[in-house]
Each structure stands twice: as structure tokens, then as C-alpha cells.
């Protein structure tokens, strides 16, 4: 974390770069707690996921609108994320998002409605895959196949507890494909 004084306010910047490469027959599940930006913070994350044929990958990333219990919803300066997924050398998925609450105004509809928590998950499986069909009624969840063997989940949740339920269901569906999956929790 890099801190710098801007005017009379403290400005905190955090950058995170992640790069994962899976060789053929490798099996990895990556999931972490949600990023929770605090007031005046700036967060920039870049993730690259590379897999060879025959590998299996589960990837989960989540965000909150801020430290809600501290009244800091949508008070961060910047939340920026880029996720790239490559199968072999082919770019199969690219997602970029940039949220600047101060620039976008309080009435911006991208505030995700009543949902202060959101997540994306990717699942790359060499075999057929069946995602869960029922999710918490308190959430909004969509699952799509975006490329051969690559599945995307997007979800909106009212709180961290509901998000964990969705994450648990998603991870269970991955483990059904291969019970020998290795997991990393950040």
C-alpha cells in the first residue's frame, strides 16, 4: 500500500498484479475474500489466468461497495479491475471495470441497485460442466458459457453472507468435476 498526502486528505493507493499459469493436467481453485475499499482509497487489480489444454481452473473475485458498517458505501475514489483468461495463447475472456463514485455521481444506476456486493467467477473445465440452477432468492446470479470449456458466473448480493453461499455452491460444482482439486484461499 502506498500512501500520499493530497491536499488535506490522505489518499491510499493499492495495486495488485496476479498471474497464474496452469500446465496440462494441472488443477487449481483460486478464491479470496471480497475487496473492500475504504473511504478515499484507490484500488487497481490486474489478473492474468493462463491454462494449457487439459488443465482445470476455478477463479473467484468479489468486491464490496466499501466498509458498509462504517458508513463508507461508495466513498472510495477508484476501484479498477482487469481480468484476462488465455487458453493456450488465445485470449478467451477479457473483463475491465472502472468505478469512480465521485465522478459518476450518486444517482448513477451502475450502483448495482440494492446490491453492495458483487462477484465474478470463471471455471475452465476440460469436460462437460453443469452449473447449479437454484441460487439464493436474495441475489441475482447469471451463468454463461463464454468459450469452449469456459464458464462465467456473475452475481449481485445484499451482503457477504449471501455472497459466501453463492461462492460455496459454485465451488461445490467445480469439485464435482474433479474431487482432487487443489485450492488456494487468499
Regions found by a protein language model. Give the residues of each.
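Single conserved hydrophobic/aromatic residue that forms the stacking wall/gate
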Residues: 1-7, 11-12
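Short, structurally constrained coil/turn elements
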Residues: 4, 51-53, 137
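Generic structural microfeature
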Residues: 5-6, 42, 116
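Internal, conserved structured core segments that host functional sites
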Residues: 13-72
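A structural signal for small-residue-enriched, beta-sheet-centric alpha/beta enzyme cores
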Residues: 61-186
